[in-house]
Amino acid sequence: MPKIAFVNGSYQTINKPSIKIEDRGFQFADGVYEVIALTNGVLIDLNFHLDRLNRSLREINIEWPTAKEAFNAICAEVIRRNRLVHGSLYIQITRGVSARDFSYPKGLKPSLIIYGRQSQKNQNLTKIEGVKVISTQD
């Protein structure tokens, strides 16, 4: 099954994304990203990650590319289309497309990319649940 990503309004196979060459994220790393763990089909600490993403966007003056309800629906659809159970969701939001220059015009439309990665169950659970240890004297 091909991996599917959400790229600027459409779902595409991950090996054929359409990112504009003059996207400021590509040219200047002008954007933010967030990675959210997925366990048993559930995004872990989703509100924490969305708050941090919101704060990061606000700090560099990038508008949210979509409404929160639509954003959550896109995340759920990427998980569904990729049949993800355990893994992570990668979210990248850039300032958008503009002619290559250090300054940028106001009102750019932000770019949004979301894709998921499958991983083994215990990789995420170890990070989330921790591991049990017993300490002994040397």
Where are these regions (language model features)?
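Conserved alpha/beta cores of soluble small-molecule-handling proteins
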Residues: M1-D138
